[in-house]
């Protein structure tokens, strides 16, 4: 989705409709392209505003806030397998990509649909294949989506359902996988990464990362 006007409430609604899923009829992710006319600080501020808007929704819908499990900026030029990031069973991943000369591709795989179509009972299959898919990736091929128009010269957010359901109907996640097409250690590929857990209202995460530090830091992890 190309974002022509930064309306956080509208963007959040798109995320809610596509990512907060309890069936495989929805994709479980959304790709937002903000173009080139932003600064890194402005971009990170959009990410934080979007997270906070989505937290209003989860508070009303699930009586749970979205709490930071992980909040960091890093320079990533490493291929990954299909996987879920380490987090609570009901969680979300917000990846904010800054413009880069390093070409990359992002793939999503609906592991829940794969599990439903397998000959093994769904919850048993999910337990076996998560958090990292270690089997032949060709088995996932019918369930894989390559994120289109993943232009490396623009600011982009990909918001992903990172959940691992223990029972149904909990929210259903999707795997993600990155492929670095042209690695180049002389250049940077900066990813702003948020992992968000559903935290029951009233509970406090004493180890929650600092939102202010994320917005103002110049530190890039390797």
Name these PLM-found stretches.
Residues 52-114, 128-132, 139-144, 198:
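Conserved double-stranded beta-helix
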Residues 1-61, 216-222:
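N-terminal auxiliary "cap/dimerization" subdomain that precedes the catalytic jelly-roll/cupin core
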Residues 108-119, 171-180:
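Short, surface-exposed, charged loop/turn segments at secondary-structure junctions
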Residues 113-135, 216-222:
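Short, cationic low-complexity segments
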Residues 135-222:
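Catalytic core of Fe(II)/2-oxoglutarate
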Residues 36-39, 99-101, 163-166:
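Short, solvent-exposed loop/turn segments at secondary-structure junctions
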Residues 30-33, 93-95, 105-107, 157-161:
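A structural signal for short, well-ordered beta-strand segments and their strand-loop junctions
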Residues 25-28, 76, 87-90, 151-155:
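Short, well-ordered loop/turn elements at secondary-structure boundaries
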């Amino acid at each position: 989705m190309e974002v022509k006007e930064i309306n956080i409430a509208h963007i959040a609604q798109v995320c809610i409709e596509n990512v907060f899923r309890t069936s495989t009829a929805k994709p479980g992710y959304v790709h937002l392209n903000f173009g080139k006319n932003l600064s890194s600080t402005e971009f990170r501020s959009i990410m934080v505003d979007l997270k906070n808007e989505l937290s209003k929704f989860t508070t009303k819908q699930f009586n749970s806030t979205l709490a930071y499990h992980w909040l960091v900026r890093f320079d990533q030029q490493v291929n990954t397998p299909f996987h879920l990031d380490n987090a609570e069973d009901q969680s979300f991943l917000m990846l904010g990509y800054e413009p880069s000369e390093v070409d990359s591709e992002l793939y999503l795989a609906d592991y829940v649909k794969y599990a439903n179509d397998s000959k093994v009972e769904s919850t048993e299959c999910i337990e076996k294949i998560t958090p990292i898919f270690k089997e032949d990736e060709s088995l996932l091929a019918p369930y894989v989506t390559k994120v289109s128009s993943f232009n490396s010269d623009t600011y982009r957010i990909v918001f992903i359902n990172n959940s691992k359901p223990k029972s149904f109907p909990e929210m259903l996640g999707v795997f993600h996988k990155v492929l670095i097409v042209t690695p180049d250690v002389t250049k940077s590929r900066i990813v702003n990464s948020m992992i968000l857990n559903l935290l029951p209202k009233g509970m406090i995460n004493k180890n929650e990362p600092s939102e202010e530090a994320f917005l103002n830091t110049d530190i890039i992890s390797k």
